[in-house]
């Protein structure tokens, strides 16, 4: 396998601390990543060349967090330009969702981002459904880092953002129909929004854990905090 076939994906439930971890590791001199420019202009891969300035001492310290300086991004617009259902699927994405066209698109995207950024490894973050089967079909040697934040902290965080889909109830969110067990837990908590956010956390943590069995333990790391 060549270096383009071994990307690393940092994954979690959402509101789980993916960004702080990526802030710590993504600026390693060997790592390339999709930036806000790749997300805004998905087909202009040459914009990854801009990310090279992060390696300059001045931009890697004093100006690192200015808006115009390239930074890692949950680049859903980029991924969605390669597979229309990537951003907000109602279920997880699996091996059977990948056809040859999709596979070639994702491989090309990773290869070009690495090429223009001039790095030997690729890392990216995304949240929600695991998408492990999907990416494992495209990149058979890819690795995953699963960030599990305390469910109480995640539930509290979800209840403090306006865009959480749980505000509109379980029939408008993306995490499927609740099992009888989970529905009764929610019901017994007076249909609490906090309880529903905790249930969302449980659904997604279990989804990622279950699908992690697709890959070997050497390619899957879990970090809890």
Where are these regions (language model features)?
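Extreme N-terminal, non-catalytic leader segments
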Residues: 1-7
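The Walker A (P-loop) glycine that initiates the GxxxxGKT/S ATP-binding motif of P-loop NTPases
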Residues: 11-12
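Walker A (P-loop) phosphate-binding loop of P-loop NTPases
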Residues: 15
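Phosphate/oxyanion-binding loops and surfaces in catalytic or ligand/nucleic-acid-binding neighborhoods
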Residues: 28, 34, 56-57, 161-165, ...
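Conserved catalytic segments around the Walker B and adjacent sensor/switch elements
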Residues: 32-35, 221
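PAPS-dependent sulfation machinery
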Residues: 36-123, 171-185
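PAPS-dependent sulfotransferase catalytic domain
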Residues: 87-91, 95, 111-225
């Amino acid at each position: 396998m060549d270096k383009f076939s071994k990307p690393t994906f940092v994954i979690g439930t959402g509101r789980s601390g993916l960004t702080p971890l990526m802030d710590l590791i993504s600026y390693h001199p060997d790592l390339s990543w999709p930036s806000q420019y790749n997300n805004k202009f998905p087909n202009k891969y040459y914009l990854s060349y801009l990310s090279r300035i992060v390696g300059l001492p001045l931009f890697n310290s004093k100006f690192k967090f200015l808006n115009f300086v390239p930074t890692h991004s949950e680049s859903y617009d980029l991924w969605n330009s390669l597979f229309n259902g990537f951003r907000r699927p109602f279920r997880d994405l699996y091996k059977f969702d990948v056809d040859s066209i999709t596979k070639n698109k994702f491989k090309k995207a990773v290869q070009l981002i690495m090429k223009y950024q001039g790095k030997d490894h690729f890392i990216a973050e995304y949240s929600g459904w695991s998408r492990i089967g999907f990416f494992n079909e495209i990149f058979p040697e890819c690795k995953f880092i699963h960030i599990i934040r305390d469910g109480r902290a995640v539930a509290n965080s979800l209840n403090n953002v306006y865009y959480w889909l749980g505000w509109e109830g379980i029939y408008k969110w993306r995490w499927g129909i609740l099992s009888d067990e989970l529905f009764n837990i929610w019901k017994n908590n007076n249909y609490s929004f906090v309880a529903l956010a905790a249930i969302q956390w449980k659904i997604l943590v279990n989804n990622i854990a279950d699908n992690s069995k697709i890959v070997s333990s050497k390619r899957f790391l879990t970090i809890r905090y």
